[in-house]
Amino acid sequence: MDSQLYYRSRCQLVDLAAKYFIPLRQSYRFKAKEVLFRAQGYGHAKQYRRMHKQVKVLKNYLGRVCRDIERYCANTAFAAEDLMQALCHANRLLSQQKRDKNKLYSLHAPEVECISKGKARKRYEFGVKVSLVTTSKQGWVLAAKALHDNPHDGHTLSESIDAAIKNTGVMPEYGFVDRGYRGHSETRLQVFMSGQRRGVTKSIKRWLKRRSAIEPVIGHMKQSHGLATNRLKGKVGDQINALSAAIGYNFALLLNKLSPT
């Protein structure tokens, strides 16, 4: 992933330099492509030491192009907005370390974050967290909100319940959540977690089994209602996409209920 980012950032800077007639000592247009393919080949063959050497070469190419443009801008006081933004992204890429927080994962969508899934098949996802509140019985989506800066699930529960109350005008009596919500501070309703034993009656136990019914809702919203791929730009676009997916899912559920078959 780093090799692709270094390559694309260098391409972006070279194209902008050509647009504004900024002279470069070398653009590395052909050499960088060759090094990128070599790095990807080594990665596919699991020759990681060789791969990291090629990634370092791509990083050096980006740094040289970046410094050329910065020197030109400093000497001529030139400051185009798109060029400054591309330089900012390039410097952010060059300075970030392996274990840094708030890393840059995408040039066209800088707000993208790395979300740890904790699953063997898919350990990480890249995007923005979305919090969903659904009814336990029929699975209507009551609230959908994009959560930036990758917050802990337990810190988002009160905010999600507030959105559900605002949308429906009804105060829920119980909430059923998974174990990711440990450490929450919600006190307005009784919250039960998956695997909880204390205070769980037979009735609550039956409702707690319904908690997993939200998983296919998330799957349907991702596959059929555009939640998996957001084509709207920026943080506002993330919020609009989450709401649109929830509205689309609710309409599909409503049509299914109204259909005669």
What name fits each language-model region?
Residues 1-173, 179:
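Polybasic low-complexity intrinsically disordered regions
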Residues 6, 153-154, 210, 214, ...:
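Short, charged, low-complexity patches
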